[in-house]
Amino acid sequence: MKSRREQDYYLGLDIGTESVGYAVTDENYNILKFNGKNMWGSRLFDEAQTAAERRTFRSGRRRLQRRAWRIQLLQELFSEEISKVDQSFFVKMKESPLILTDKTNGQKYTLFNDDDYSDIDYYSEFPTIYHLRKALLVEDRKFDVRLLYLAVHHIVKHRGHFLFQGSVNNATSFHSVFDNLKICLRDEFEIELECHSEEKIAEILKDKKKSKRDKCNEIFNELNTDKSNKQIKSIVTLISGMKAKVADIFADESLLEIDKPSISFSESSYETLRVELEDVLGERCGVIDIIKCVYDWAILADILADGEINGKSYLSVAKVNLYDKHKEDLRILKQLFKGNHKVYKEFFVDEGKSNYCAYVGFVNSNGSKKNIKRCNREDFIKNLKNQLGKIEKTVSNQSEYEFIEQEIQADTILPVQISKDNGVIPYQVQGMELKDILAKAEKYMPFLSVKDSDGVSVSDKIVKIFEFRVPYYVGPLNGYNNTNSWMVRKSDGKITPWNFDNKVDKDASAEKFIRKMTNKCTYLVGEDVLPKHALLYEEFNVLNELNNIKIGANKLDADLKKDIINNLFKKKKKVTGKNLREYLKCEGLINDDEEITGFDINFKSSMSSYLDFKKILGDKIDNYSVKMMVEQIILWITVYGDEISILKRVIRKQYDDNQISNEEIKKISRLKYQGWGRLSRKFLGEIEGADKETGEIRTIIG
């Protein structure tokens, strides 16, 4: 007989994400004791976190470090000239956030402390930085080098987004964003978006006098589409700034159950919602981004609408006009409110949650400005409407009251310099202004035209600093921490935006990036995973879905799955359940009464990359050698991203004109693929085994 210490027992575990519960029992499930205490309990701990949060902080830290690096390089270019005028200028700028007692120079003013020019004069002449930028553009006089630096510093610090490639005309072109939308809808949903006039749609979107609903209806009428098409209607609704259901946009009823089933680009919370959407939609979120580009174009067109000088639209000119409009709107509003002292004080003077002070972010306290927490525009407008309701009966100037109401209705009242709308400004708009400011300044500041031993002028270096982005496949430029650095150098020395191509071997760095950053196969140790859009990996995902399908109680056989792939997935980017049923009926494999089970309404997988390359290469994509070439090109597209010049170069270096033409390379360079799978080529296509029933030698993918 076993002693009590040797008897059999059960150990039960309840393992969760934040706790582990345990219990020890005998064979009859009675809790056992040890040292007089029941052997059960739990251990609590913090839930494990993925690397995503760390990566977000690291990316943000690097972004700020690179911004500081750009500013440092800019200061080095200006330092000699500025030191001739004010040797402590950069020190004063650095210490500007400090109180007077903490400053090393003990000066009251933060920028200018000359005998004949101080900060008071500066802010009187240039109420905002955009007033200074505009003056440098349009006024024919010599400016202090410090003023030039302040304007250039602002542009270099706030460059704009890099979503569009090419010239400023391409970045601000409606045709460009609308064409991208048409391509996206054709590829993702097989929707041919045709319209009577692109120019008319652009004019509708830009019209400030039209309501969002009117814009939506008029744009929809301009499209050559079925008026009952719910999907197109929801996309147009979104473009117009109204709220649309995600399920309608994707024609996917399963999306009705998500936490936030409706979205609107005009809401201040959209950017937060975008992160949540990506978790649900995955790569399909790219469709939302392309739709938003059309919406963003309308905002950009509105921002630049009043900024035209000599055929060019300048941001600074537009922003100065916004400042003037805000000033005039504020004057009218204060005039309306003056008849009611209490309401006036609550809205314009006191520190509140959604009054004017909260809207602009400061309140006048004891003769000085005090920064306070800002409210969003939606809350401010809501409060403004309420306050106007209180004074409606006491207003003496009815025309001004009606003007304010119209401005509120059009959402153009009291525009501010800093808002979320600034996020739609592409770097090309800022870059054009920077180049024109420098070109004008070169006439009276000769140091800007001085060239170094490589023939690069100071102005050219400033533009290079502004346009420079470290390619993600090059990684950190500081090789101090070798575990997170893989850059390959061509030569030693300090790396700057204007010598980057001479100091860094981008091709070798990209190859090293592939080897370092590519994940490894889930099942085979040391084998690199395939790109998410590799031909083989997409075919595997399609087969994975087909393997679950049943006609009645029977699964599809191998030959039928192959036929479905050849006749449906290799012809359509989006295969639906309806497409499958129609195909099986045409082949005489099912009748109207038989049920198809094992998948959702539509297939989630597709062979999109096969179809992309078939459009470019034709039927030769089915040749084995061409297919292997395509697989390699897909890998390069995934790695190099937007670096089109490198992509073209590596393709041409590897394959000659007989294998792929320059025109084909040009078309291929427009393709965009992102993401990686979890399985390797060796696992899917090279490991062989014998079928137990037939003895046939096969791979995992067949």
What are the residue ranges of the model-derived segments?
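Extended, Lys/Arg-rich, non-catalytic nucleic-acid recognition/anchoring regions
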Residues: 1-702
